[in-house]
Amino acid sequence: YRQCRDLVAPYLDGCHLMDALSDYAFAEKGIVSNPVAAVQHLQPFLDAGVSPLWCYYSGAHGCRDYTGRNLSMPSARTRMIGVQMYLAGIDGFLHWGYNFWHTKFSYDTVDPFLSGDCGGFNPSGDCFLVYPGENGTAMESLRLHAMRGAMEDIRMLELYESFFGRERTEAMVLEIAGGTLNFREYPTEERFFRDLTARVMTDCAGK
């Protein structure tokens, strides 16, 4: 990997060299300057204070405790990635599989209305967030709305932080979550987001 990187790096001066990782060694040795860690492998990156640090969750589908966007998951579990990213100080999210309506390696196409798992490639829902509509348009899924909610949650918490500071914001989130919220342990019910939004609106009303 290092040899391949060194081969092309001189031609990419000034560009961001990013890659999706599961092994911290690539960041530790400086082979990848902008690592994008899978959520189930994030902890070593967080412990080392890697910055900038992005995350993604495709590939975490075999890890039942982690968030994702599988059809079998409640929307609250999909949406949770935003609050998790805020608390962990993650800089960005790698989003793949917007409209991947193919089998593994794209050998064939699939009908996403009939095959949510892309011919057995990944768990249903992992490979796409939209469905084909008329005249080349995209039909949004509920999972896409949940992902938008996740990004809006980050903006909401950043606004709260601008009024009350980081420490109080984190304490408020953890209080509503029942004391614990990380990438492996987190609320999975919609009520958490209703309570969180209500608290933010109430506290910020006079600002």
Regions inferred by a protein language model and the residue ranges of each:
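Catalytic-core regions of glycoside hydrolase
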Residues: 1-106
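Catalytic domains of carbohydrate-active enzymes that cleave complex glycans
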Residues: 2-23, 90, 106-207
